[in-house]
Swiss-Prot record:
Localization: Cytoplasm
Name of the protein described by the UniProt record: Tryptophan--tRNA ligase
Organism whose genome encodes this protein: Aquifex aeolicus (strain VF5)
Region (Insert): 117-179
Family: Belongs to the class-I aminoacyl-tRNA synthetase family.
Catalytic activity, reaction form: tRNA(Trp) + L-tryptophan + ATP = L-tryptophyl-tRNA(Trp) + AMP + diphosphate + H(+)
Length: 395
């Protein structure tokens, strides 16, 4: 089976990337023909104004991929933007893809919903505030506000001042904070690139006639759209593309140090580039069961991020079982539990860290490997595009 998948270059990789994606890719490359690409064009859908670090981020992904076990001898590891045919097929797919299909994309729907919700909240807030201020203005003695224009002017100025002070100063920032986005980014993300990125994903997969795409459940709508586009193209111009299947694999969830989803933007991630001292700081500050304040307090391992990590890094199943039992019984304190975890986490991280150091010294050589793989990928992509142009009667 031909497997195709990609990853946006947002910087150095962390434990969440490994358990969510890379570990599965490493297994797949042993059994299938795999194409894994650094999706630098996709990075621009939400970060088109901040390209200063893009090239360095691409290098970091290259290093981490190889350090974590992806092998350019077993997989085609390449950079999306070096294969220009992705963009050509994206353009042609865009001609046949109804806009309504894209507007059903859950990610886009969420953006539009949040935009509308924020606008509605602002409108509702302003109207209620104006009503309240109007009541206050009406309480002012008539001889001070006998001029209607003065009354209106006073009402307008007070309303605007209160909106700036309350909504724009306190309420709106809190909403945007919960959405994890700045106000400018929030509005400027509503672009053609953001609307159309699922079509680019379809082109990424189908340019290699990908048959399988390893994804999580949240990506299923995108794979279904790729299948719809393939079907529509085949119906219009003749059978060129397979209908790719989603390869749903069970991946362990590794929470961040604060219990939320592990993310660079949340500041709760452990990176493969972190030195031992930095990892220790992060682990010792990890959130635990809030009800377990003292060592002899009974704990609830099922809600504790530290125990979730034990299940991944502490390989001795009997020890994991004992940690769970001792935590529940109040025989194991959180500090000691973290120190046990740290020992096993370091056994996992140190070999990867060492490989990373060696790879960093050979970055020019590694870049050339990715460039050469990109040339291999492009040869295949060019053959696909020859078939596409012929089917569409393009020169």
């Amino acid at each position: 089976m031909r497997i195709v998948s990609g990853m946006r270059p947002t910087g150095k990789l962390h434990l969440g990337h490994y358990f969510g994606v890379i570990r599965n890719w490493v297994k797949l490359q042993e059994e299938h023909e795999c194409f894994f690409f650094i999706a630098d064009w996709h990075a621009l859908t939400t970060a088109y104004k901040n390209t200063k670090e893009l090239r360095q981020n691409i290098r970091e992904v290259m290093i981490d991929w190889l350090a974590l076990g992806l092998d350019p001898q077993k997989s085609v590891l390449f950079i999306q933007s070096l294969v220009k045919e992705h963009a050509e097929l994206f353009l042609l797919f865009g001609m046949i893809t109804p806009k309504s299909w894209l507007e059903l994309n859950p990610t886009y729907k969420d953006l539009k919903y949040n935009l509308l919700r924020l606008t509605d909240l602002e409108k509702e807030f302003k109207e209620k505030l104006k009503e309240r201020i109007s009541e206050i203005v009406n309480l002012i003695p008539f001889n001070i506000t006998k001029e209607e224009k003065f009354r209106e002017h006073l009402l307008e100025n007070l309303t605007q001042t209160m909106i700036e002070a309350l909504f724009e100063g306190e309420i709106e920032p809190e909403i945007l904070k919960r959405l994890n986005v700045s106000k400018r980014d929030f509005y400027e993300t509503d672009t053609f690139g953001f609307l159309g990125y699922p079509v680019l994903q379809a082109a990424d997969i189908l340019i290699y006639k990908g048959e399988g795409v390893p994804v999580g459940e949240d990506q299923l709508p995108h794979i279904e759209l790729s299948r719809e586009i393939a079907r529509r193209f085949n119906r219009l111009y003749g059978k060129i593309f397979p209908e790719p299947k989603a390869l749903l694999t069970e991946t362990p969830k590794i929470p961040g140090t604060d219990g939320r989803k592990m993310s660079k933007s949340y500041g709760n991630a452990v990176f493969f580039s972190d030195e031992k001292e930095e990892v220790e700081k992060k682990v010792m500050k990890m959130f635990t069961d809030p009800q377990k304040i003292r060592k002899n307090d009974p704990g609830r391992p099922e809600i504790c991020p530290v125990f979730s990590w034990h299940k991944l890094f502490t390989k001795d199943e009997e020890l994991v079982k004992k940690i769970e039992e001792d935590c529940r019984a109040g025989r194991l304190g959180c500090v000691e539990c973290k120190r046990i975890l740290l020992k096993h986490l370091e056994e996992f991280l140190e070999p990867i860290r060492e490989r990373r150091r060696e790879l960093e010294k050979r970055i020019n050589e590694i870049e050339e490997v990715f460039y050469e793989n990109s040339r291999k990928a492009r040869e295949i992509a060019q053959k696909t595009m020859e078939e596409v142009r012929k089917a569409m009667n393009l020169p």
